[in-house]
From Swiss-Prot:
InterPro entries on file: PsdUridine_synth_cat_dom_sf, PsdUridine_synth_N, tRNA_psdUridine_synth_TruB, TruB_C
Protein name stated in the entry: tRNA pseudouridine synthase B
Gene that this polypeptide is encoded by: truB
A Pfam short name: TruB_C_2
Gene Ontology MF term list: RNA binding; tRNA pseudouridine(55) synthase activity
Annotated active site: 41
Family: Belongs to the pseudouridine synthase TruB family. Type 1 subfamily.
NCBIfam families noted in UniProt: TruB
Enzyme Commission code(s) on record: 5.4.99.25
Function: Responsible for synthesis of pseudouridine from uracil-55 in the psi GC loop of transfer RNAs.
Organism encoding this protein: Prochlorococcus marinus (strain NATL2A)
Keywords: Isomerase, tRNA processing
HAMAP family according to UniProt: TruB_bact
SUPFAM superfamilies (alphabetical): Pseudouridine synthase
Amino acid sequence: MEKPFGFVVIDKPSGLTSHDCVNRLRKVFGIKKIGHSGTLDPAVTGVLPIAIGDATRLISYLQGSKAYRGIIQLGATTNTDDMQGEIIESKAWPLITQNYINYLLENFRGEILQKPPIFSSVHIKGERAYKKARKGEKFDLIPKKVTINKLNLISWSQDKGELLVDVDCSTGTYIRSLARDIGDKIGCGGYLKSLRRTKAYNFIENHSVKLPEKSDFYPEGDKPKVLNPNIFFKHLSSFELISEEEIISWRSGRKISFQNNVKRLKVTKNNEVEDSFIHNNHILVLNKENKILGIACLDDSFAIKPKVVFNAIG
């Protein structure tokens, strides 16, 4: 039986860690080689891509932004910047209009400096920030650059003091920090009340399935569908190996001559061949059936050099 290879996109429920979801799928598929592409906080729901089998070796080559829909509660701040923490200050929110809020949100669009929450996985001298925070240690975190591609105000409830927002942002952005900083900008404090991830890299909600509830016995036909990884790597240029000799060389870890085979390269949209390689971009290596054989890059001798090889020989 062919081993499963690809991605399962889970619609993560609230209350479970990302690792809980991975463990559930390990039992469902009966294999250990399963991993997620990025942690979601337990309270957060939504798109959680999980690599199955050797596809775990592709995780580091995923690329793209992440998107969320969340509710920001004005009028209070918490020590975690979300509703899981303790309220440390309360202040009535002002009478404001949706137009005024949109005006203030302009400060958070584009490239900004953002300070992570103290309850976060950021390392401080070899220790996670949240561990220091739990021990009551005082420390400061250095702001880092993040990019907010889109920040749209969907609705504003003056009665509840709630902002409903859609955010598209770079990897590493903390929506909790965004909620905190927006509340500070309005002048009354704020925290993240709820959050759902709607996109991660090229994975969207339409790809997602419910997390299996029972993991001790799962009929073969009922397992979550493993999606072909090709559709999630359209940002990479690709090169096709057409002969059995080339495929054997590739599986043996040898370089493949590229110089006389430029026509077999499919360059990503709006990208020139020179740019694709001068900047050492990664290349998806495929066979004639469009199956992924691995990941390569172009070396100084203008040959395709293996970086990840599936079904390696020797």
